[in-house]
């Protein structure tokens, strides 16, 4: 028959308990030695019996070295866990603080909008009223400042436009004055202006006089000149000229 499963509980029989302790202790020490050799691991095993007797095993008999290493690791682990716990606690604390602050701000915002005023007493309502009046005062002050700045800017632009308008008017007056002076000069010097203009308009004739026949007007003028020349001459000379 196979061996039955041992129930894991305290052995009440003192002798059986002592025998089991001796067997299990030897097996445990043997397993510690095997894992140390096979796996090249540092193993430290400490066992105290019911009577307080110490049984131990350490790789290369370096119990102190292993315990010191264990203490360093344990301390670092505790510090890390403590730091993480502290950080986690700080984050939770900060979250609660921020959440409360946000709720307070939202509540104040509703009060400023005239909502949820039923929960406020007389003193709180008076404080809210003073806060609103102070806010309105700052708002009006800022509004007036912006209005004054806007008016000053418009006045500056107005002055600039007026100066430009004056400059244009001055230029126009000077042009009108120059035009009037030119017209007056032309009125006081008509011959000079007309002769200069006619000289510009007319070109000198290029036709040969000796080759063209005399016009009727020219022959008439020539005959009149001859008749005038005959006046006062003696009759014999006139007949001689006519012949």
Curated annotation (Swiss-Prot):
Where it sits in the cell: the answer is: Nucleus
Q: Which GO terms describe its biological process?
A: cold acclimation; negative regulation of vernalization response; positive regulation of transcription by RNA polymerase II; positive regulation of vernalization response; regulation of photoperiodism, flowering; regulation of transcription by RNA polymerase II; vernalization response
The K-box domain sits at 88-178
The conditions that induce or repress this protein are given as: Accumulates during vernalization in cv. Bd29-1, but expression is independent of vernalization in cv. Bd21. Repressed epigenetically (H3K27me3 hallmarks) by RVR1 before vernalization and in the fall season.
Describe the inactivation phenotype: Confers vernalization requirement for flowering in cv. Bd21. Lower expression of VRN3. Reduced freezing tolerance upon vernalization treatment associated with a constitutively expression of cold-responsive genes (e.g. CBF2, CBF3, CBF5, CBF6 and DREB2A).
For molecular function, the Gene Ontology terms on record are: DNA-binding transcription factor activity, RNA polymerase II-specific; protein dimerization activity; RNA polymerase II cis-regulatory region sequence-specific DNA binding
* UniProt keyword annotation of Endoplasmic reticulum present: no
For this chain, the annotated S-S bridges are none
What SMART domains has UniProt attached to this entry?
A: MADS
**Which residue ranges does the record assign to the MADS-box domain?**
1-61
Polar residues bias located where? 179-192
Name the domain of life.
Eukaryota
Which sequence ranges form a coiled-coil region, renumbered to this chain? 122-178
Q: Which InterPro entries match?
A: MADS-box/MEF2_TF, MEF2-like_N, TF_Kbox, TF_MADSbox, TF_MADSbox_sf
Give the primary localization class: nucleus
A cellular component term, taken from the record's GO annotations: nucleus
Region annotated Disordered sits at 173-243
Alphabetized, the UniProt keywords read: Coiled coil, DNA-binding, Nucleus, Transcription, Transcription regulation
Database matches in PANTHER family: SERUM RESPONSE FACTOR HOMOLOG
What the protein does? Answer: Component of a grass-specific mechanism of vernalization, a process by which prolonged cold exposure provides competence to flower in daylengths longer than 12 hours. Involved in the exit of vernalization and confers flowering competency at the expense of freezing tolerance, probably by promoting the expression of VRN3; this process is essential in cv. Bd29-1 for flowering but seems do not occur in cv. Bd21.
- This protein is called what? Protein VERNALIZATION 1
């Amino acid at each position: 028959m196979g061996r039955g499963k041992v129930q894991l509980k305290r052995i009440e029989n003192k002798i059986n308990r002592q025998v089991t302790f001796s067997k299990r202790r030897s097996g445990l020490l043997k397993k510690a030695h095997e894992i140390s050799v096979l796996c090249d691991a540092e193993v430290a095993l400490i066992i105290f019996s019911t009577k307080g007797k110490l049984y131990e095993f350490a790789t290369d008999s370096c119990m102190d070295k292993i315990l010191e290493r264990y203490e360093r690791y344990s301390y670092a682990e505790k510090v890390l866990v403590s730091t993480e716990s502290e950080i986690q606690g700080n984050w939770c604390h900060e979250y609660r603080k921020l959440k409360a602050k946000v709720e307070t701000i939202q509540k104040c915002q509703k009060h400023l909008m005239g909502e949820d005023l039923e929960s406020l007493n007389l003193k709180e309502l008076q404080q809210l009223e003073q806060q609103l009046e102070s806010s309105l005062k700052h708002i009006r002050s800022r509004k007036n400042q912006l209005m004054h700045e806007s008016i000053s800017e418009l006045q500056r632009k107005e002055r600039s436009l007026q100066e430009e308008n004056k400059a244009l008017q001055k230029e126009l007056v000077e042009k009108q004055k120059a035009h009037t002076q030119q017209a007056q000069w032309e009125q006081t010097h008509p011959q000079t202006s007309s002769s200069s203009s006619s000289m510009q308009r007319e070109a000198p004739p290029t036709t040969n006089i000796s080759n063209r026949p005399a016009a009727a007007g020219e022959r008439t003028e020539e005959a009149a000149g001859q008749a005038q020349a005959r006046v006062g001459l003696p009759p014999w000379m006139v007949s001689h000229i006519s012949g």
